Amino acid sequence: MFSTSRIISRINYNFLRKSHYSTKTVAEQAKGRFTPLIQKLSAVQQPIMYWANVSKELVQQVYHSQKIAPPSNTHSPFLFWKSQSSEAWGRNFFIAVEIVGIFCAGQMVGRRKITPYH
């Protein structure tokens, strides 16, 4: 009676013995299949890099000429949320619940049933 590990090792040995592909032949086949693709991609690479550099220079010129700068802390979007009072938060919460309810009712009317699409 054979143990499972002995059977598996025997199967692996037979598989490796019967395989007629060596690493070298597999590498040669892969090289033969991918060489045309690599040549096409290398032909496209130069125009892509050229236009990427042109775009970068154009963006830099616009950035400097328009005096664009990253937003400062005085215009931070978090200041809007910090300035909200608890009354405003409650009002906005109930407005959001109302909007979600109207959306769900519209979905039910559109599907002509209360349950989801299933």
UniProtKB/Swiss-Prot annotation:
- Name the Pfam families for this protein: ATP-synt_G
Gene Ontology MF terms in the entry: proton transmembrane transporter activity; structural molecule activity
An annotated GO cellular component of this protein is: mitochondrion
Gene Ontology biological process: proton motive force-driven mitochondrial ATP synthesis
Sorted UniProt keywords:
ATP synthesis, CF(0), Hydrogen ion transport, Ion transport, Membrane, Mitochondrion, Phosphoprotein, Transport
Supply the InterPro entries for this chain: ATP_synth_F0_gsu_mt
Query: What does the record give as the function of this protein?
Result: Mitochondrial membrane ATP synthase (F(1)F(0) ATP synthase or Complex V) produces ATP from ADP in the presence of a proton gradient across the membrane which is generated by electron transport complexes of the respiratory chain. F-type ATPases consist of two structural domains, F(1) - containing the extramembraneous catalytic core, and F(0) - containing the membrane proton channel, linked together by a central stalk and a peripheral stalk. During catalysis, ATP synthesis in the catalytic domain of F(1) is coupled via a rotary mechanism of the central stalk subunits to proton translocation.
Subunit: F-type ATPases have 2 components, CF(1) - the catalytic core - and CF(0) - the membrane proton channel.
What this protein is called in its record is ATP synthase subunit g, mitochondrial
The coding gene here is: atp20
